[in-house]
A protein has these predicted regions:
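Short, contiguous alpha-helical
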Residues: 7, 11-18, 29-72, 109-168
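Membrane-proximal, proline-rich intrinsically disordered regions
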Residues: 24-26
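Acidic catalytic patch
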Residues: 95-110
């Protein structure tokens, strides 16, 4: 199918979210980029936003409802990871049953209409943007980072220097 690349991308992007979340510690949840500035989301707020916004986009724009509350009962790091892994896994299973007409069908994107493929692409970039913010938070906390799209400074530097790629 022409849109398999989007499904394949989601399959890896959901794992990248979980990988970044796994690099935080439980006591990091309240940390925000600047402790006295509420404009920068805390790690906890980023996890809430990822779970709630992805659930909302999939239900209201893509017509995929996993039938579960978007947030875990206890909002701990491990519970967020478990909830997101389960729900995103169900979404992935549903995406694998789509066909080309489904992707090309028009759907509401806030106050405009777009194809599901267009909306889904925006969802992927939205998630990637927030994952980048969280990766910056890990760097600010002085943590080593696992590879995301290839080698990082933490895994040996630049690709042209044959740095290894290390995934969590």
């Amino acid at each position: 199918m022409r849109y398999d690349f989007l499904i394949d991308t989601y399959a890896t992007e959901r794992l990248k979210v979980l990988s970044v979340w796994s690099e935080f510690r439980d006591d990091d949840l309240a940390v925000r980029p600047k402790h006295d500035d509420p404009r920068g989301r805390s790690v906890h707020e980023q996890m809430v936003h990822q779970c709630v916004s992805e659930d909302t986009w999939f239900r209201t724009m893509l017509g995929i409802d996993v039938g579960a509350p978007p947030l875990p009962e206890q909002e701990t790091r491990l519970a967020f990871m478990t909830r997101y892994a389960e729900d995103s896994g169900r979404r992935l299973d549903r995406l694998r049953r789509t066909d080309e007409p489904w992707w090309e069908e028009s759907t509401a994107f806030f106050d405009v209409r777009r194809s599901r493929a267009w909306v889904f692409t925006r969802r992927l970039t939205h998630t990637s943007h927030h994952r980048g913010q969280q990766t910056a938070m890990l760097r600010m906390l002085g943590r080593d980072l696992h590879s995301n799209y290839g080698p990082t400074a933490d895994t040996g530097g630049l690709m042209q220097h044959h740095a290894p790629t290390i995934y969590a």
